[in-house]
Regions:
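Proline/Glycine/Serine-rich low-complexity intrinsically disordered segments
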Residues: 11-278
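Bacterial N-terminal signal peptides
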Residues: 1-6
Length: 278
């Protein structure tokens, strides 16, 4: 799938409604006092973003078959901020093909939530983070706890998926909590729903959507947090560029900072996460 990035007419209205429905809570990742240089991008003939269609609400195809999602709207906003609306394109590929396509010059930037690793840094250039994905607790609504923060879970059973960064993070951050491990997210959430554990600790994005799903049956709600850790959860979501993309990465950093400061980044976030992650 391949499309030009023309901004949809309804975008501003959706963002305005989200602003009313939820308080903004997107962490600020760019210091207001920081001045980021913006290279001249006027000679760049086109800016080709690569993404996928299997990571809702970040990138997916809508009911009309068009690319949609947080990343699609972010790409449009970045292009507008850089004055490159008519030069921007976006193409969807299978996730497994993104790195090879970028190295082969089939695109200029990957906007698909790729996790930064030391190995990838040897092959690609990355922008600054535009979003951090936190860990959160979730509790059953009928479970009585002696407080409103994580201390209320001390000496209590809290479920977590075995062998994950969240298990290591739970043990490191909260040694007084009794971790109960599960092999899968499904068995973890089933145990929480059946009140076999007092709470669970996992990825906030997955928990947020589960609490609103029919499967949860309004049993549970997010509790305390958010908890962020580069050591356990990584650097956050960034844009991945080819090895010669340093100048473009600097330009995108400058544009991301501008979107953060003028509120546009938060508008896009609230459109797709009206209940918040933080």
């Amino acid at each position: 799938m391949f499309v030009l990035l023309a901004a949809p007419a309804q975008a501003q209205g959706l963002a305005g409604q989200a602003q009313i429905d939820a308080a903004g809570d997107l962490p600020v990742l760019f210091d207001a006092r920081e001045r980021l240089a913006r290279p001249d991008v006027s000679e760049i003939l086109r800016l080709r973003f690569l993404t996928t269609t299997d990571f809702p609400p970040f990138n997916f195809t809508d009911q009309t078959g068009r690319l949609a999602g947080f990343h699609i709207d972010l790409a449009r906003a970045l292009c507008a901020e850089l004055g490159m609306e008519t030069k921007c394109q976006i193409q969807a590929l299978p996730y497994a093909q993104l790195q090879d396509a970028l190295e082969a010059g089939q695109g200029d930037a990957v906007l698909a939530g790729v996790a930064v690793t030391a190995a990838l840094r040897q092959r690609f250039v990355f922008s600054r983070p535009y979003m951090l994905l936190p860990a959160r607790f979730i509790r059953h609504r009928e479970t009585q706890l002696p407080g409103g923060d994580a201390a209320a879970l001390f000496d209590r059973p809290v479920g977590v998926i075995a062998g994950t960064a969240h298990e290591m993070m739970l043990k490191a951050f909260f040694p007084d909590i009794k971790p109960v491990t599960f092999e899968t997210r499904e068995t973890l959430l089933a145990a929480l729903k059946d009140r076999k554990v007092d709470a669970a600790f996992a990825d906030a994005l997955q928990l947020s959507f589960w609490t609103q799903s029919p499967a949860a049956a309004n049993c549970c709600r997010l509790f305390d947090g958010p908890y962020l850790s580069e050591k356990f959860l990584g650097e956050g979501m960034t844009i991945m560029l080819g090895p010669q993309g340093g100048t473009l990465a600097t330009a995108l950093d400058s544009a991301l900072a501008a979107l953060s400061r003028n509120g546009r980044l938060e508008e896009i976030y609230l459109r797709y996460f009206p209940s918040g992650l933080y």
